[in-house]
């Protein structure tokens, strides 16, 4: 019986940071196969792709196993949702037309089995924290900037995007080991009191006490934290280190990993 709702994020498919990108994709496809008979809906909460840009007639190569499995589940009646992350912000209508997916460019508040969820990738909430990121956020979502980018041949843009992503992640890992961690990447170095998504959830919950659960991706952290009055905030981890996801069965919301199923 299809009764469970799943949430996952940050697979970064195609990333050169993965020791073996194909292994990551196969693992993700295997997870989808395992949950196919129980899944009522699946929410992919951003950065499932390390880079994604849709031209009018062209999309990035690869991801065949993942997209094929998602298409199978959609055809079987599973509700599919994709959120734009900061790496795959340039989604348009491909996933909707080919997979029947609901695409969300911003966070949403939705009722699921009687509880109210605030769902977002997590990058949008950083705009109020750092002005430079707010400028970058606006630039990446600017229609003119997108039009100009689309005018450049993919031969140049795809390699450049993957290269910038890899450099950014390596730089973040280096800062982490020095104790300077604007991007935490790892629970081992995580300061929960200063995490902006935790602060956002606390502040938002004070203004919107009707929200029961907050679920984010983006930070590559595994977090399940209690707020006031039995409210909770979850950060989903990733498919780089944790192979993790959350599942809601209408009564219980838990963080799990692919290894828990083996």
UniProtKB/Swiss-Prot annotation:
GO terms for cellular component: cytoplasm; plasma membrane. It catalyses: UDP-2-N,3-O-bis[(3R)-3-hydroxytetradecanoyl]-alpha-D-glucosamine + H2O = 2-N,3-O-bis[(3R)-3-hydroxytetradecanoyl]-alpha-D-glucosaminyl 1-phosphate + UMP + 2 H(+). This is UDP-2,3-diacylglucosamine hydrolase. Binds 2 Mn(2+) ions per subunit in a binuclear metal center. GO terms for molecular function: metal ion binding; UDP-2,3-diacylglucosamine hydrolase activity. It comes from Porphyromonas gingivalis (strain ATCC BAA-308 / W83). It comes from the Bacteria. Disruption phenotype: Loss of viability. Pathway: Glycolipid biosynthesis; lipid IV(A) biosynthesis; lipid IV(A) from (3R)-3-hydroxytetradecanoyl-[acyl-carrier-protein] and UDP-N-acetyl-alpha-D-glucosamine: step 4/6. Its EC number is 3.6.1.54. Its main location: membrane.
């Amino acid at each position: 019986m299809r009764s469970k709702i799943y949430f996952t994020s940050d697979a970064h498919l195609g990333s050169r940071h993965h020791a073996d990108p194909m292994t990551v994709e196969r693992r993700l496809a295997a997870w989808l196969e395992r949950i196919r008979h129980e899944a009522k809906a699946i929410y992919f909460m951003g950065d499932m792709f390390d880079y994604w840009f849709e031209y009018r007639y062209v999309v990035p190569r690869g991801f065949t196993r993942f997209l094929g499995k998602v298409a199978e589940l959609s055809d079987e009646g599973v509700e599919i949702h994709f959120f734009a992350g900061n790496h795959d912000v340039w989604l348009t209508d491909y996933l909707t037309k080919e997979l029947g997916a609901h695409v969300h460019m911003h966070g949403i508040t939705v009722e699921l089995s009687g509880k109210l969820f605030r769902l977002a990738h997590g990058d949008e909430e950083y705009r109020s924290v750092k002005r430079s990121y707010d400028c970058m956020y606006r630039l990446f979502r600017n229609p003119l900037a997108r039009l100009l980018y689309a005018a450049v041949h993919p031969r140049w843009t795809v390699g450049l995007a993957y290269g910038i992503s890899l450099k950014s992640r390596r730089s973040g890992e280096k800062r982490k080991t020095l104790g300077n961690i604007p991007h935490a990447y790892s629970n081992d170095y995580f300061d929960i009191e200063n995490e902006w998504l935790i602060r956002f959830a606390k502040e938002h919950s004070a203004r919107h006490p009707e929200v029961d659960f907050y679920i984010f991706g983006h930070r590559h952290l595994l977090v399940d934290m209690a707020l006031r009055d039995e409210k909770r905030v979850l950060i989903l981890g990733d498919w780089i280190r944790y192979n993790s996801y959350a599942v809601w069965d209408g009564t219980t919301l838990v963080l799990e990993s692919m290894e828990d199923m083996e």
